[in-house]
Amino acid sequence: NGHGYYSAKRFFGKMFDRATLHGIPPIRFTGATLSEGSWHYQSIWNVGGGKNLYDVDTREWGSTTSQGKDLRDVTYANYFPVGMGGNFPINANSTVEQYEHIQAISVGLGTTYSLYLNQKDVESCPQKEAIFKVIRTWENARAANAFPRDKKKLLTKPEKNWRLLDGENKDTWILNELKDGKKVKSYILNRA
């Protein structure tokens, strides 16, 4: 309507107020552009997807452009979470190891990602149940703020392999560093 950012903020403000009035839980928004006031209504900053950001197969950032390298700089100590796009759909070729790695990178950098789910593709994945368990375990630990800064820094290293397990007690986890599929180090994590 020609009123720029002001009208966008008014629109989203009214939409959120109306949603609250109708008992609708908070609405999550993503957008590709940070603009004046967008933090009022955007939940995450979606800076793209595909191999422009993170390539889980080659474990490199920005394998086709420099966007991935930029993403790491943006996410560190930023209160506005950045998304790695919808790069990691579950399909017949997906493995538990890939999702342990994706979650480690995501937690280490403080990013989110969009998980594309297509029933036919998910059902074709022999490791689907284990993959969902991996995602749930990592997200439970993340929600509990169980990763201290020194562990987060370790998780950002693409050459490392990790496995996160539920601990013996509630609100505890065991973070194992793996080399050639074997545990080389273990760290006990606790709810903060």
Positions of predicted regions on the chain:
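Active-site groove signature of glycoside hydrolases
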Residues: N1-H3
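Active-site-proximal substrate-binding groove within the catalytic cores of carbohydrate-active enzymes
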Residues: Y5-A192
